[in-house]
């Protein structure tokens, strides 16, 4: 685990974005941890979040031309990541996001920002069922662009309805790499360093045994 990943886990814990306990997910599964990126909800939170996304992007080595944030949660993420790439990595990248409802006046269309073209890096908070990615792919392909990769904050590394995860399905269906700031494996490595969190470690490991990929 790299320094920025450990710092991201501590940031998420401090903002209660990441919690340990017992939580019922939308899928009905009982999970020993919960991650709600919507609680990164202040200016300082967003500035820090962008830096972590930018670190993960640079670390990945994936080449791309433009950042795309799917509405709605991906919009502030794409924006803050673009700012962080410019301020901290001297990479001034175009960014773009979609509207859920197309405008019929003014600039019109369902896209805001730079022209959607070239190799696109899609940024979002998490991938649960992959629905937002599929909707975004239709927009990307309709504009003649290609998907270079997907960046999310957390990869839960757990099976969907079948034997593989929603992330693995996206990688298979769109022949792209999905990267994340942290994974379930990183969370476990972090918990292993914290004796006071031993009860949570046991629960997370048991969950991985049952649902992990």
Curated annotation (Swiss-Prot):
<dbReference type="GO" id="GO:0000287">
    <property type="term" value="F:magnesium ion binding"/>
</dbReference>
<dbReference type="InterPro" id="IPR000836">
    <property type="entry name" value="PRibTrfase_dom"/>
</dbReference>
<dbReference type="GO" id="GO:0046132">
    <property type="term" value="P:pyrimidine ribonucleoside biosynthetic process"/>
</dbReference>
<dbReference type="InterPro" id="IPR023031">
    <property type="entry name" value="OPRT"/>
</dbReference>
<comment type="pathway">
    <text>Pyrimidine metabolism; UMP biosynthesis via de novo pathway; UMP from orotate: step 1/2.</text>
</comment>
<keyword id="KW-0665">Pyrimidine biosynthesis</keyword>
<keyword id="KW-0460">Magnesium</keyword>
<feature type="binding site">
    <location>
        <position position="105"/>
    </location>
    <ligand>
        <name>5-phospho-alpha-D-ribose 1-diphosphate</name>
    </ligand>
</feature>
<dbReference type="GO" id="GO:0006207">
    <property type="term" value="P:'de novo' pyrimidine nucleobase biosynthetic process"/>
</dbReference>
<dbReference type="GO" id="GO:0044205">
    <property type="term" value="P:'de novo' UMP biosynthetic process"/>
</dbReference>
<dbReference type="GO" id="GO:0004588">
    <property type="term" value="F:orotate phosphoribosyltransferase activity"/>
</dbReference>
<feature type="binding site" description="in other chain">
    <location>
        <position position="100"/>
    </location>
    <ligand>
        <name>5-phospho-alpha-D-ribose 1-diphosphate</name>
    </ligand>
</feature>
<comment type="subunit">
    <text>Homodimer.</text>
</comment>
<keyword id="KW-0808">Transferase</keyword>
<feature type="binding site">
    <location>
        <position position="128"/>
    </location>
    <ligand>
        <name>orotate</name>
    </ligand>
</feature>
<feature type="binding site" description="in other chain">
    <location>
        <position position="26"/>
    </location>
    <ligand>
        <name>5-phospho-alpha-D-ribose 1-diphosphate</name>
    </ligand>
</feature>
<feature type="binding site">
    <location>
        <position position="99"/>
    </location>
    <ligand>
        <name>5-phospho-alpha-D-ribose 1-diphosphate</name>
    </ligand>
</feature>
<feature type="binding site" description="in other chain">
    <location>
        <begin position="72"/>
        <end position="73"/>
    </location>
    <ligand>
        <name>5-phospho-alpha-D-ribose 1-diphosphate</name>
    </ligand>
</feature>
<feature type="binding site">
    <location>
        <begin position="34"/>
        <end position="35"/>
    </location>
    <ligand>
        <name>orotate</name>
    </ligand>
</feature>
<dbReference type="InterPro" id="IPR029057">
    <property type="entry name" value="PRTase-like"/>
</dbReference>
<protein>
    <recommendedName>
        <fullName>Orotate phosphoribosyltransferase</fullName>
        <ecNumber>2.4.2.10</ecNumber>
    </recommendedName>
</protein>
<comment type="similarity">
    <text>Belongs to the purine/pyrimidine phosphoribosyltransferase family. PyrE subfamily.</text>
</comment>
<dbReference type="GO" id="GO:0005737">
    <property type="term" value="C:cytoplasm"/>
</dbReference>
<comment type="function">
    <text>Catalyzes the transfer of a ribosyl phosphate group from 5-phosphoribose 1-diphosphate to orotate, leading to the formation of orotidine monophosphate (OMP).</text>
</comment>
<feature type="binding site" description="in other chain">
    <location>
        <begin position="124"/>
        <end position="132"/>
    </location>
    <ligand>
        <name>5-phospho-alpha-D-ribose 1-diphosphate</name>
    </ligand>
</feature>
<feature type="binding site">
    <location>
        <position position="103"/>
    </location>
    <ligand>
        <name>5-phospho-alpha-D-ribose 1-diphosphate</name>
    </ligand>
</feature>
<dbReference type="InterPro" id="IPR004467">
    <property type="entry name" value="Or_phspho_trans_dom"/>
</dbReference>
<keyword id="KW-0328">Glycosyltransferase</keyword>
<dbReference type="Pfam" id="PF00156">
    <property type="entry name" value="Pribosyltran"/>
</dbReference>
<feature type="binding site">
    <location>
        <position position="156"/>
    </location>
    <ligand>
        <name>orotate</name>
    </ligand>
</feature>
């Amino acid at each position: 685990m790299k320094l920025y990943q450990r710092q991201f886990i501590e940031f998420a814990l401090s903002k209660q974005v990441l919690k340990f306990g017992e939580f019922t997910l939308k899928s009905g599964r009982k999970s020993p941890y919960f991650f709600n990126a919507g609680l990164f909800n202040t200016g300082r939170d967003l500035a820090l979040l962008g830096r972590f996304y930018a670190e993960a992007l640079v670390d990945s080595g994936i080449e791309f031309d433009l950042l795309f944030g799917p509405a709605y949660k991906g919009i502030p993420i794409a924006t803050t990541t673009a700012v962080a790439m410019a301020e901290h990595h001297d990479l001034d990248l175009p960014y773009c996001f979609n509207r859920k409802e197309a405008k019929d006046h003014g600039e019109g269309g369902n896209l805001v920002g730079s022209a959607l073209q070239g190799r696109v890096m899609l940024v979002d908070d998490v991938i649960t069922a992959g629905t937002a990615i599929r909707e975004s792919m239709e927009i990307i392909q309709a504009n003649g662009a290609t998907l270079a990769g997907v960046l999310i904050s957390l990869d839960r590394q757990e099976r969907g309805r079948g034997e593989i995860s929603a992330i693995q399905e996206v990688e298979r269906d769109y022949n792209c790499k999905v990267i994340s700031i942290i994974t379930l494996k990183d969370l476990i490595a972090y918990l292993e360093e914290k004796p006071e969190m031993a009860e949570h470690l046991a629960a997370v490991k048991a969950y991985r045994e049952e649902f992990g990929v």
